[in-house]
Amino acid sequence: MTEAGAKKAAGKKSGKGKGKNAKKNQPNITPVAENRKAKFRYEILDSVECGMMLMGSEVKSMREGKLSLDEAHIRVTNGELWLVGSDIAHYNNAGMWNHDPRRPRKLLVHAKEFDKFAGRAFERGLTLIPLRVYFSERGLAKCVMGLVKGKKLHDKRETIKKRESDRGLQRAMRRK
């Protein structure tokens, strides 16, 4: 074995350097888009992570941050979950192979989670909405779906009052 080959083999055995565990310790999950109004408009009861079926131009556009979840919701149709009302802008370099910005997108979820969420989504007053969209460590598009209940006006006011009182407490604690 040559000297360079011996160093290479020794480096692998020692376990130093970058390996599979290097990424696991530092998750880099930055959201592409968040539904910021969801916490204000709805009471979030439960959430689950699901995959998204996307076209190539949609993925590239999402990586540029051109995704809006403002009017989006999730519909259950024929035993499948569909993200409806989200807007992924056209990708500039896609040319004639671009996607429809408002098309419904299929969400992928395990059967047990589907049964749990789809069954509860049909209860009165509950709905499914996307809370956050991001790319996983493997580069897959993921959507965090939430089972929510709409807040009344007085509930929203309570939330605002609670938030303001918490801020006041934080300010008082910093002064001491």
UniProtKB/Swiss-Prot annotation:
It holds the Pfam family SmpB. It is found in: Cytoplasm. Keywords: Cytoplasm, RNA-binding. Residues 9-23 have a biased composition (Basic residues). Residues 1-33 are annotated as: Disordered. One of its GO terms (cellular component) is cytosol. CDD domains: SmpB (cd09294). One of its GO terms (biological process) is trans-translation. NCBIfam families: PRK05422.1, smpB. This is SsrA-binding protein. It comes from Rhodopirellula baltica (strain DSM 10527 / NCIMB 13988 / SH1).
